[in-house]
Design a protein with these regions (language model features):
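Structural motif
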Residues: 1-2, 23-28, 50-52, 60-63, ...
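A generic, well-ordered mixed alpha/beta core segment in the N-terminal half of proteins
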Residues: 1-58
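Short, hydrophobic/aromatic alpha-helical segments in well-folded domains
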Residues: 14-15, 109, 127
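Phosphate/diphosphate-binding glycine-rich loops and adjacent basic-rich segments that engage nucleotide
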Residues: 35-103
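A long, hydrophobic alpha-helical segment
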Residues: 100-115
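Conserved phosphate/anionic-ligand binding catalytic regions in large, soluble enzymes, centered on
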Residues: 113-121, 125
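Short, well-ordered loop/turn and helix-capping segments at boundaries between secondary-structure elements
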Residues: 127-134
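Conserved small/polar residues in nucleotide/adenosyl-binding loops
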Residues: 137-139
Length: 139
């Protein structure tokens, strides 16, 4: 199933839990507005593009739910609101320098998990989301 013109759908594992409880395997993902720089870049090109995979496996299902960024954007927003620092190496400021300042990170860009591998996953999600829904691809 593909859903067009959707917004933030919340925690992906919520949907995976529903599927696996009905003995179904699920793979869900979505693209998002640019907030993630590809490996080696200093400007946002991809969204944080969450990925979720779930499989019923007996008593306890296997569910993997993660974004392609090193840290969830909501955590950065919360840190900004509370005046807290974010971990080193997860975001760049608008000048392309690593920052631990949440406000600067929100004005800059986030970094991908696993370097070029995370960039590849973000690109894959962006392309598949666009193709499956006949929608805009952000790249």
């Amino acid at each position: 199933m593909a859903i067009k013109k959707s917004g933030h759908y919340g925690l992906s594992s919520f949907y995976a839990e529903q599927a696996v409880s009905n003995k179904l395997m699920v793979f869900c993902f979505t693209n998002a507005p640019a907030a993630l720089a590809p490996h080696g870049a200093k400007k946002s090109l991809f969204g944080t593009n969450p990925i979720c995979f779930g499989v019923p496996t007996g008593k306890v299902p296997f569910i993997y739910d993660a974004s392609t960024s090193m840290i969830n954007r909501g955590i950065i927003r919360r840190a900004d609101k509370l005046g807290l620092k974010i971990p080193y190496g997860v975001a760049l400021n608008k000048k392309g320098r690593i920052t631990t300042n949440a406000k600067e990170a929100l004005q800059g860009t986030q970094l991908p998990i696993a370097g070029f591998k995370g960039s590849g996953l973000a690109w894959m999600v962006d392309i598949l989301s666009g193709v499956f829904t006949l929608s805009l691809i952000h790249i």
